[in-house]
Amino acid sequence: NLIRGAYHYYRPDEDPKLQAASYLRNTNLQKGDFLPILDVEKLPKQKSLEQFIADIQTWMDIVEKKYKRKPILYTYISFYEDYLYYHFKEYPLWVANYNNVAVPTSLFDWKMWQFTENGITAGAKVKIDFNVFNGDENDLKELLID
């Protein structure tokens, strides 16, 4: 079986309420799909760090209210460690780390690890992201919509 999902690339200088509304309007996640995923990769240019954190929390709260589960946070390990950990440690973590390591060396409990954006596989005409799951089948089910 193939598990599908939908992520939102967070734009830090834009309104988080409008971004969450757009995500909810344009996705139709079903039972068995991944929980909603928020991709946070950049700091804002026009907002303080405090406002940035508050805005991410606003997006998370709006989407969590709809699905009754905490969304998955996708980000780079260093970005998570530097800016997000203390505020979002209760959210499932999907990390990106392309540094040719056996496993990410993070003290944090990551659920998924995207280790390349240059994967090649049968049936795909372009390079794709490859990921590793950190857990067993029951752990995976925790990341899916009931």
Task: Report each predicted region and the residues it spans.
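Short amphipathic alpha-helical surface micro-motifs
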Residues: 18-21, 74-78, 92-97
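Functionally critical loop-and-helix segments that line ligand-binding/catalytic clefts
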Residues: 88-146
